[in-house]
């Protein structure tokens, strides 16, 4: 365990999620009673049975009596130095009795038995490039989940060094197709953790919005802030040469979600 990456209060306990490149993230909890150091108990290990492909407990959020854990792999879903991934993120649901469910992710056998995604979605909400469940928040009785997608970085990736299978997949559709159709973060919401509605699949129609960095509930609606580093210029390739051009879609953005009965996003 290299880092306590995220913490949350839930069920009268403090929960801590770690980074563990060898075995996968761990979740620990404590009542924080008496004099420190406190008594901690591990409630999840080995990345919830997925190993290093769930390297990091990226985000924790309490929602309707359960603690939701969003996973990821460092560096956006591909830890190149340690050759972990690439792989998309998962979403786990922890209960007060330490039992857990796979909300979104890869079906598998675990020490606790078989786990299947109760939402029906594979890792990344069926989007391979969603390397993190980066941020979660609760508003108006719904859980909001924001991702990080690295698809918009494909033009800058050393694809020629990838496996033959991966190169063929990219070549079949073309890099531009992946950027256009897979670029930009996702935002999903649910009132029960099982049935999900997609708010955006492409960074609010901006593939440069590669991730959701904050979700905040307010009396005026839910506000969602993005990360967008492709600014003020963006490198593009023309006639085999790279050049920087002004990118009007670059720079972070803040979006407000309309509450039920209110018109517009």
Task: Give the residues covered by each predicted segment.
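Recurrent small/Gly-Pro-centered beta-turn motifs in extracellular repeat architectures
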Residues: 17-19, 70-73, 146-149, 225-228
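Trp- and S/T/G-rich repeat-edge/linker motifs of beta-rich repeat architectures
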Residues: 1-5, 9, 13, 22-58, ...
